[in-house]
Amino acid sequence: MERIASFSVDHLLLEPGVYVSRIDRDPATGAVVTTFDLRLTTPNKEPVMNTAECHTIEHLGATFLRNHAEWSSRIVYFGPMGCRTGFYLVVFGEVTSEEILPLVRELFEFVADFEGDVPGAAPEECGNYLDQNLPMANWLARRYLDRDLADIDENHLHYQQA
């Protein structure tokens, strides 16, 4: 089998940022989707996110994105990476990291400032509704904004090659 694109990124060089992971086209319709790698922690160097805060960011992020005035109709998916170092954001259209950056900043401001009941955190709405950690989700979002997104540069918007 061929190695998939995400495994060809050198995770020893990868740092937190906003990267285009892949751009896919439906061969039948020509529809395009862009997958973004929203990397919150440095792989294999910083601790990964625990499932509870990851789950909370997923609930808040999906709710925010699917209700966004400009982007809601273009959102395909938002959810955690299996390695728990970040999230995937999938949108309709061919979109660059620079173009998605304002939305990513808005999204993580929403998560960082969120107070109250986490949307979808009820037994009839979620299969693991008790696995939530809002204070840690707030903290991770604020750190991503302040440390990684505030003065983001080219090296953190495009994958670097060895």
Explain the meaning of each model-derived region.
Residues 3, 22-25, 39, 66, ...:
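Arginine residue identity/basic-tract feature
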